[in-house]
């Protein structure tokens, strides 16, 4: 390994004494101020509320002008850039027809509005009635309050071997394909060769035929349950209208980076401020983490044994499911 000179000395070192050299202090202060002037100021007003490094980028949080909301900013070669937080829909009244999954196309049954799912956060059991929010983009139309949220799923029965998240599935006779993101079992079990349920899918191609084998790597896992799958089903209802995400003002931010999946390049950034919901950021999608707490404003965030932990005032503690923040 070679070394390269980055500067050349201009004579031998000279010792200077501030008590005897009246200009030394002012010279040093001038140099300090010169370097300070090179620092780009985070936009907004008041104190910087938190700074963190994620995926090689520096992020800072500071109240926007006026103090109504906080801005999330990323450092760049041209200065601080505000991060767009995207649009979201709150939902409730979930069903057993399948779960909302990232990458899926959804539509409003009444409005006909459409969007693509970018992130999902919810609390409670999906099969019995969960509540949460879904971050979306590529939006057309206007979603209405309390309308059914629909998406495409594949119904199956005769399940003999578990179908897992991210499995690539193929229809044995139709040649149709899709990638599985969630599996919902409504009755039966793989152990008794009679599992019944729904596959929440993305990247689907072709139309599946009733009773054809659903294969993974050429091996039968289940049978298609119904003609012309995938079919459009209701998975939840909107709880309000589409809104632009914002961050509550003030707070003191804590952060942690962690990869819950174990695959390369899937580390995400998690934050808590004490004034709003905790959040997740993957470099593209910002989503607030809903826990169901009455006052859902955690002060601290940490990861322990593949669980995300959030702490609240007066000692309350919430933790995620294993590997599922």
Where do the model's predicted regions map?
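Recognizes the extracellular SEMA beta-propeller fold with strongest preference
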Residues: 1-111, 140-153, 158-174, 203-325
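Short beta-strand-centered aromatic/proline hotspots
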Residues: 114-126, 176-190, 224-235
